[in-house]
Amino acid sequence: SLVESYDFDLIINAAKTLKDKKIKFLIKGRGKLLQHIKQQKEKYHLENLTIDSTFVSNEQIVKILQESDVLLSPMGNSKVLNYSLPTKILEYQAVGRPIICASDGAVGEYVEETKSGLKIKQGDVYSLIESILKLESNPELCKTFGDNGRKNIEDKNTFDKIGKELSLLILYFVKLESNIW
């Protein structure tokens, strides 16, 4: 979603700085910020930035994510998103790609703890550029981050495992309640 919850200016500013490199950026989606992003692309003549607002199926989304070298999560100042875990991060991990997460909250901490990518300070374009260049020059690190993310999903976040944990939690509360009364 191209909404204020995400800092797309961070990506635009990185694309401006890296426009003479072979690094390409893709922003895919729809939302309130689509026109702003398109205007910035035109204003700065960003040939290295593709904006695609066409609808795609879930299968196509998976393919697009798998074809990407690195996946970005530029969190904005939304407390709700910064202190929750957007499913987008789990999708990124599921396809086994490294993540660069601009977050001062739980999202960045999660990426760091699962060793599935790099956490940078929110809004810090220089850290984003440095992280992009670091991953570009280190395919082995990209693979390690991607593998770690995928393993995290397989070990902890399948429907089966979540269902079992939820069942145990429900049993715990049922027993707790029966002991109270």
Residues covered by each model-derived region:
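A conserved mid-protein helix/loop that constitutes part of the nucleotide-sugar donor-binding site
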Residues: 3-17, 35, 126
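Short acidic alpha-helix that forms the nucleotide-activated donor recognition element
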Residues: 16, 36, 56-68, 94, ...
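Nucleotide-activated donor-binding/catalytic signature segment of Leloir-type glycosyltransferases, i.e.
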Residues: 22-29, 34-63
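Short alpha-helical segment that forms part of, or immediately flanks, the ligand-binding pocket
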Residues: 59-62, 86-95, 105-109
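Short hydrophobic beta-strand element within catalytic cores of glycosyltransferases
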Residues: 70-73, 91-102
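Short acidic/histidine- and often glycine-rich active-site loop of Leloir-type glycosyltransferases
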Residues: 83, 104-114, 118-119
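Conserved acidic donor-binding segment of nucleotide-sugar-dependent glycosyltransferases
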Residues: 113-114, 118-125, 132-140
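A short, well-ordered alpha-helix in the C-terminal region of glycosyltransferases
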Residues: 127, 134, 141-155, 162-168
